Amino acid sequence: MSWVQVNLLVRSLSRGWGGLCRPALSGTPFAQVSLQALRGLHCSAATHKDEPWLVPRPPEPQRKPIKVPAMHEDLFKPSGNRERDKASFLNAVRSFGAHNVRKRGHVDFIYLALRKMPEFGVERDLSVYNLLLDVFPKEVFRPRNVIQRIFVHYPRQQECGVAVLEQMERHGVMPSAETEFLLIQIFGRKSYPMLKFLRMKLWFTRFKNINPYPVPRDLPQDPLDLAKLGLRHMEPDLSAKVTVYQMSLPSDSTGMEDPTQPHIVGIQSPDQQAALARHNPSRPVFVEGPFPLWLRNKCVYYHILRADLPPPEEEKVEEIPEEWELYYPQKLDLEYSRSGWDDYEFDVDEVTEGPVFAMCMAGAHDQATLIKWIQGLQETNPTLAQIPVVFRLARSTGELLTTSRLEGQSPPHSPPKGPEEDDETIQAEQQQGQS
């Protein structure tokens, strides 16, 4: 830079700073100082506008046209009359590797494949997850030195690998040795996906059989079999008997008296039958429900037949024979060396409820269907004929019905509703009842 250019630059800067310092020293208000400063700086900028060679601008880089990536959605669209099954999903994953040799956009493709897995029914297949991990390029994302190990090396790719393992964990898929080999080959041993794999390998083996009442992985598709499974899952007594009171008619049945006949399945144990036989006929029993029960990803609804807690004067204390006390003592008075500060009782909030006499699952939750269930229970429980029944359903107010009305009255069925509309109505009415 020549002396002439330096001189011009210093003069322009002195003009700007002079406009700032001179009014401040003379006691000018702050608003006027800022205004004068802006004017001085504006004038200096105007003088340099005619001299572009003083402050040269860097050349703007040429913007390349953005390449729109190929839409991966087309790979998962079934061609022709093919169904959405495992074969079509594997074909889509393999076609991505065949058409895209350099595997550009593989992270977006893997995220899309994870979202599409439930549609193809392969969210519980280990081989499909291993095939998705095989989409990653090998030996590229492994850290090579200490600095790369300290900082997250290729974070977006590691997050995608962790997302694959998290979906496996969500669906209860145990990773195998092939999964470990792929993770080491892709990300190395010192990586977040490998750390996630080690944690899954540790805790999956410990929590695999933690549920004392396991539910089968593949649930039956028939509503009747699903109802039997749900009732067996709720009833702790193994001697309880499952009874089918009414079978559902097929959808193409015509010319029948009741074309909308739903299924009715009930369960009752011998102890419940004995408790119902000892029930006071002057006190009513209640049919309550429907209550939800989740069996993995399916929700079924059940009803119960219960009674209120009897008053203390009507409770009968069962005497335990002395022979039972010898083999199965009910009370143990063992004196250990304890001080007066020891608490012999635990703080447990126990709420005593009335007895439950039976449970059922039906294809419809209206009063007409549950009346047929009560009529079926009267065949094995004769004392139920002298006990009034009160229906406390979520969609109706309680109505007192005696046995004579149950036998002589057969209300017409309500128009059939779809399962989604039926579930939404039940949930809405349950919320209204709670409020």
From Swiss-Prot:
Superkingdom in the source lineage: Eukaryota
GO CC, any one term: transcription regulator complex
Tissue: Detected in heart, brain, lung, liver, skeletal muscle, kidney and testis. Detected in embryonic mesoderm and epiblast, and in extraembryonic ectoderm.
Modification after translation (UniProt): Ubiquitinated on Lys-372; leading to translocation in the nucleus together with RELA and NFKB1 and expression of NF-kappa-B-dependent genes.
Position(s), cross-link Glycyl lysine isopeptide (Lys-Gly) (interchain with G-Cter in ubiquitin): K372
Primary localisation category: cytoplasm
GO process annotations (BP): BMP signaling pathway; cell surface receptor protein serine/threonine kinase signaling pathway; innate immune response; mesoderm formation; regulation of oxidoreductase activity; regulation of protein complex stability; regulation of transcription by RNA polymerase II
Key word Mitochondrion present: yes
Molecular-function GO term, any one: chromatin binding
Pfam families given in the database record: ECSIT_C, ECSIT_N
Cellular localization per UniProt: Cytoplasm; Nucleus; Mitochondrion
Region of interest (Disordered), residue spans: 401-435
InterPro entries (alphabetical): ECIST_C, ECSIT, ECSIT_N
Recorded family membership: Belongs to the ECSIT family.
Protein name: Evolutionarily conserved signaling intermediate in Toll pathway, mitochondrial
Organism annotation: Mus musculus
Name of the gene this protein is made from: Ecsit
